[in-house]
C-alpha cells in the first residue's frame, strides 16, 4: 500500500539541505547519504547521489525515470554469487 497523497513524499531534511546547497554552488561532487528511505524528487534530476548499501557508497546518477522511487532501490545491498552446480543423484 502506498503513502497517502495528502502527506506527500518523504525526504530526509538533511538531504534536501545538501541538494539545495549543491544547486546553489553547482558542485559536481556526489552527495553522500545514508538515507535509503528518501524519495527521489524532481529537484534531484542531474545530480549524483552516493547511497550507502551497508558497506560502501554507490554513486547513483538521478534521471527523470527515477522520480518517485526510493534511493535504496538503486543501491543493492546483497550480491548473488549463484547456486552451486551440485552433483547429480547416482542411480
Curated annotation (Swiss-Prot):
Assigned keywords, A-Z: Ribonucleoprotein, Ribosomal protein, RNA-binding, rRNA-binding
Spell out the GO cellular component terms annotated for this protein, sorted alphabetically and separated by semicolons. cytoplasm; small ribosomal subunit
| One MF term in the entry's GO annotations | rRNA binding
The signal peptide stretch is none
- Extract the InterPro entries matched here: Ribosomal_uS19, Ribosomal_uS19_bac-type, Ribosomal_uS19_CS, Ribosomal_uS19_SF
The GO annotation for biological process reads: ribosomal small subunit assembly; translation
Protein family membership: Belongs to the universal ribosomal protein uS19 family.
Query: PANTHER family recorded for this chain?
Result: RIBOSOMAL PROTEIN S19P FAMILY MEMBER, SMALL RIBOSOMAL SUBUNIT PROTEIN US19M
Main function: Protein S19 forms a complex with S13 that binds strongly to the 16S ribosomal RNA.
Protein name per the record: Small ribosomal subunit protein uS19
Source organism (scientific name): Dechloromonas aromatica (strain RCB)
Q: What is the lineage of its organism?
A: Bacteria, Pseudomonadati, Pseudomonadota, Betaproteobacteria, Rhodocyclales
